[in-house]
Amino acid sequence: MPAKFLKRSFAILFTGCLLMAFSFCSCKKIALLTGGQSALEQYFADNVLNRDFVVDFASDTTSDITSKYTGYTFVLAKDTSFYSGPMTATRNNITYSGTWQSNNDYSKLIINLTKPSIPDKFVFLNRMWKFTKKDPPILKLAPWVITSPKVLYMRRL
């Protein structure tokens, strides 16, 4: 009886220690330690990074401003991180550049196109966005904090 009790106690203690160890170590850290990517990083890399996107729909309050972005191709490039990097907007061989940034669960996207001086139409794009839907080829975005009815849909080519 005591041996059976000790085996059961050891099994419970061992399981508890494993659960505690995993709770202190995130999936991202485990992926980094093993040299791999988290599932979110892989999904974002496969479906968003280094891909061409166009604006399918843009609405600023009640105005449809989609036509302002006709002909532009947008690329969020992967640099050294899965969470930030360079971004470009190109139309007729004219390229505007800047940066993009996201948080660790990819719920936020910060767009900052700055060079050379940006056209007024990009002021709408340069903000903190939240993903309302990531269903490639369509990315649906709304302002991160502001509850105004601004909407941006980008489609992967």
Which residues does each predicted region cover?
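Sec-dependent bacterial lipoprotein signal peptides
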Residues: 1-27
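Lipid interaction determinants
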Residues: 27-95, 105-157
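Acyl-CoA/ACP chain-elongation machinery
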Residues: 100
